[in-house]
A protein has these predicted regions:
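N-terminal accessory interaction module
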Residues: 1-21
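Conserved non-cysteine loop/helix-boundary elements of the Radical SAM core domain that shape
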Residues: 107-266
Length: 266
C-alpha cells in the first residue's frame, strides 16, 4: 500500500503542473476516500491530524478534506449503533434484461437464461428458509436487507411477491432499519411491481439511469431511454417511495463533459 501511495503522489506531482487546475481530490483514486480518513483516525490520529495528512500528503482540497473527515466521523458514529448480534442480509437476483458493456457482476440476460428464473427462485426460497433457521439459532437479528443483482425487478410482480413473502415469513424483521430493493433498470419497473414492494415494507429503491443521454444508453447496451427513467421515478414517487437513489457513471462510451453535465442537471 505504501508503494502504491508513493507512486500515485509521484505521478500527481509530475502531472499537475501541466493541468489547468489541480484535482480537488488530489492524488486519491477510488470511491471511498472516507475509508482512508477513518483508518487514520482509528490508528490514533485526531481528526485535525487526519485532515492535515489529507491536505499535505494526498493534496486533497480543503473543502473535500472537510467533507471526508465529516463522512468518516459519521460512519464511526453509525457503527456504534450496530449491536454485536446485528446482521445485514443480501439477496441476489442474477438476471438482467440486457448486459451493460462495463458490467462485471455475475448476471445473465433474460433472453439467454429467462427459463432459469423460476427454478432459481424455487432454490432461493429454500435457501432463505434454511438461512433464517441458522440466523435464529445463532441469536442474530436482521437490521438491514438489500436485494440486488443483476436486476431484481426482472422478476414479474408475482415472483417478486413470492420472494418478499418468503423473506417476511422466515426472517424476523421486527428490528429492521433499512429495506432496499435495487430496481435498477427503469424498463423493468411497473406500478404493479412498485405496489408489491411498498406493501412488503420496502423503504428504498434504486433507479439507475447511469446516463440521461439516449445515445450513450444505446452505446452501453441499455434497452431504455431517458424518458423511461423519468417515468419510473414518477411512478416510484406515486407509489409512496420517499427514498430513491440513482447511479450515474461518468465517462461511458460516447459521453462527454457536456453530456454528463446535462445528465446531472436533469
Amino acid at each position: 500500500r505504501t508503494i502504491t501511495e508513493l507512486v500515485k503522489t509521484t505521478v500527481y506531482d509530475a502531472v499537475v503542473p501541466f493541468l489547468p487546475q489541480a484535482p480537488v481530490w488530489g492524488s486519491l483514486t477510488g470511491v471511498r476516500p472516507a475509508k482512508l480518513a477513518r483508518g487514520m483516525i482509528e490508528r490514533g490520529m485526531t481528526r485535525g491530524e487526519a485532515a492535515v495528512e489529507l491536505r499535505e500528503h494526498f493534496h486533497v482540497s480543503p473543502e473535500r478534506t472537510a467533507l471526508t473527515i465529516r463522512a468518516a466521523a459519521t460512519a464511526m458514529e453509525m457503527d456504534k449503533t450496530i449491536g454485536e448480534n446485528d446482521i445485514s442480509l443480501y439477496v441476489g437476483i442474477p438476471f438482467c434484461p440486457s448486459r451493460c458493456y462495463y458490467c462485471s457482476f455475475v448476471s445473465a440476460t433474460t433472453a439467454q437464461s429467462g427459463k432459469l428464473i423460476e427454478p432459481y427462485l424455487d432454490t432461493l426460497c429454500r435457501e432463505i428458509e434454511e438461512t433464517a433457521a441458522l440466523v435464529r439459532a445463532a441469536g442474530k437479528q436482521v437490521q438491514s436487507v438489500y436485494i440486488g443483482g443483476g436486476t431484481p425487478t426482472t422478476l414479474d410482480e408475482h415472483q417478486l411477491a413470492r420472494l418478499l413473502s418468503a423473506l417476511e415469513n422466515h426472517f424476523d424483521f421486527s428490528h429492521l432499519r433499512e429495506y432496499t430493493v435495487e430496481a435498477g433498470r427503469p424498463d423493468t419497473i411497473t406500478p404493479e411491481k412498485l405496489r408489491v414492494l411498498k406493501s412488503a415494507g420496502v423503504g428504498r429503491v434504486s433507479i439507475n439511469p447511469q446516463s440521461m443521454n439516449d445515445a450513450v444508453l444505446a452505446a452501453i447496451g441499455r434497452k431504455h431511454g431517458s424518458a423511461d427513467v423519468l417515468r419510473a421515478f414518477d411512478e416510484a414517487r406515486q407509489a409512496g417511495f420517499d427514498e430513491i437513489n440513482m447511479d450515474l457513471i461518468a465517462g461511458l462510451t460516447g459521453d462527454t463533459a457536456d453530456t454528463f453535465a446535462q445528465t446531472v442537471d436533469t
